[in-house]
Amino acid sequence: MYRMQLLSCIALSLALVTNSAPTSSSTKKTQLQLEHLLLDLQMILNGINNYKNPKLTRMLTFKFYMPKKATELKHLQCLEEELKPLEEVLNLAQSKNFHLRDTKDLISNINVIVLELKGSETTLMCEYADETATIVEFLNRWITFCQSIISTLT
């Protein structure tokens, strides 16, 4: 009698582990999405750091919120919340000498990737650090976040 219950328990446990365990293809997909996010963030940062950017000093006056801790994909919620202000600052800075092509598309791509990576169920309330960050610091920290997560996946 107990033997049947034990076998049922083992079978259910195996089914649960098999269905919930991440597969190598899902890890690869996550890694690719993070790499795309990383490239988009680096593209924005490179455009801002361009030596011909006369609006950089103005851009540095805008402050962005950073999470106290960003170590998991769910923390991308905090990046998502700052995308609109980021887009607004980038649009303000557009000029003849400084032009990020398709800022709206870049931000939209980042938003789509972030939503896929963090999952739709995430309702994390971001705990922000007391100090704010400049646009350069903001982008550098999220770039470092992506690199860190990618390194754990490989």
From Swiss-Prot:
Signal sequence coordinates: 1-20
Disulfide bonds: 78-126
Keyword Zinc-finger found: no
GO molecular function ontology, one term from the record: interleukin-2 receptor binding
Glycan attachment sites: 23
Compartments where found: Secreted
CC annotations in GO: extracellular space
InterPro entries, per the entry: 4_helix_cytokine-like_core, IL-2, IL-2_CS
Keywords: Adaptive immunity, Cytokine, Disulfide bond, Glycoprotein, Growth factor, Immunity, Secreted, Signal
Single GO biological process annotation from the record: positive regulation of plasma cell differentiation
Pfam families cross-referenced by the UniProt entry: IL2
Family, as annotated: Belongs to the IL-2 family.
Function recorded in the entry: Cytokine produced by activated CD4-positive helper T-cells and to a lesser extend activated CD8-positive T-cells and natural killer (NK) cells that plays pivotal roles in the immune response and tolerance. Binds to a receptor complex composed of either the high-affinity trimeric IL-2R (IL2RA/CD25, IL2RB/CD122 and IL2RG/CD132) or the low-affinity dimeric IL-2R (IL2RB and IL2RG). Interaction with the receptor leads to oligomerization and conformation changes in the IL-2R subunits resulting in downstream signaling starting with phosphorylation of JAK1 and JAK3.
Name of the featured protein: Interleukin-2
Name of the gene: IL2
